[in-house]
Amino acid sequence: MFFIIHSLVTSVFLTALGPQNRTMHFVTEFVLLGFHGQREMQSCFFSFILVLYLLTLLGNGAIVCAVKLDRRLHTPMYILLGNFAFLEIWYISSTVPNMLVNILSEIKTISFSGCFLQFYFFFSLGTTECFFLSVMAYDRYLAICRPLHYPSIMTGKFCIILVCVCWVGGFLCYPVPIVLISQLPFCGPNIIDHLVCDPGPLFALACISAPSTELICYTFNSMIIFGPFLSILGSYTLVIRAVLCIPSGAGRTKAFSTCGSHLMVVSLFYGTLMVMYVSPTSGNPAGMQKIITLVYTAMTPFLNPLIYSLRNKDMKDALKRVLGLTVSQN
C-alpha cells in the first residue's frame, strides 16, 4: 500500500510543482545549509548520522522480519508494531540520506519540486506515526481494560482496517497545506538554514506575507499533533487506573513494562514535535531548531526498537528464532 501511495503522490506532485505550473516563482532550487562548520566537525557529524541511520534500518528491519516470519507474533499488537517499525524505516529515509549527501557536498542544493516532495513525505510519514501511536495505545487499552472483549473487538480484520486507515489517513492530511505553500512567490534569496524543507523557513523565504496560509498550516499541525495525543492520553489514563487495580504485583509490573516503553516513545516523539511545531518557532534560534529536528527525524526512529520493541521478551525470543532459522538454512 505504501508503495502505491508513494508512486501516485510523486507523479501528482511532480506535475503540480513542475515549471509550467510555477510561472510566478523565480526560485528553481533551494540551498539546505544543514550543520555548517569546520570540515573535521562535519566529518564527525556525517559518521554519527550514518551509523545512526544504519542501526535504525537494522533494528527496525529486524522487527519487521520477526513479525512477518514468526507466526507467534501474528497478533494485533505485533502486527501494529511491525507496521510501526516499517514506517520508521521510511520516516528516517525521507530526510537522512539527503542530509548525508548535503554534508559531503559543496553544493547543497535541492530542486523546488524535490524540496516540496521531501516536505510532503516527511510530514505525511510523521502524521502516520502519530496515528499509529494512537492506535497502539487503543490496542493496549482494550487488552488491559477489556481483556474479555479484546479478542472479539480487535480481530485480525479490524486490525488490518486500522492499519490501512493510519497509512491512508496520514498521506491525505498534508496535500492542501503543501500546495498552498508551493504557490507562494519565491523570488529570492533561496537559502534554507535548516536540515530539511520545513514550513517555517519556507514562509520566511516567500516574497509576500501569507497569514492565512500560515494559519492553515498551524491549524493542521495542531490538530494532527493534539488529536492523536489526547487519544493516547485518554487511553493511558484508563490503562494506568486499571493497572493500579491489579492485585498481583507481577501482573502490574508486566503491564507497566509494556505501557511504560510505549509512553517513553510517545513522550520523546510528541515532546519534540510540540516544541517545534505547536509553540511559536520564531523565538527559537536556527541551531536549536536543527537539534530538535535531528531528535525526531533520526534519534526517535533509532531509539524506538531499543526502548519499545527489543525490551519485549516475545520479540527478543522471535528474533532469536528467526536468526537461528536463517543460520540453519545457510
Curated annotation (Swiss-Prot):
Q: Does the entry annotate any disulfide bonds, and if so which pairs?
A: 115-207
Keywords of this entry: Cell membrane, Disulfide bond, G-protein coupled receptor, Glycoprotein, Membrane, Olfaction, Receptor, Sensory transduction, Transducer, Transmembrane, Transmembrane helix
Q: Which CDD domains match?
A: 7tmA_OR11G-like
Enumerate the glycosylated residues.
21
Keyword Magnesium among record annotations: no
Give Gene Ontology CC terms. plasma membrane
Family membership noted in the UniProt record: Belongs to the G-protein coupled receptor 1 family.
The free-text function statement in the UniProt record for this protein reads: Odorant receptor.
Q: What is this protein called?
A: Olfactory receptor 11H6
Please name the source species: Homo sapiens
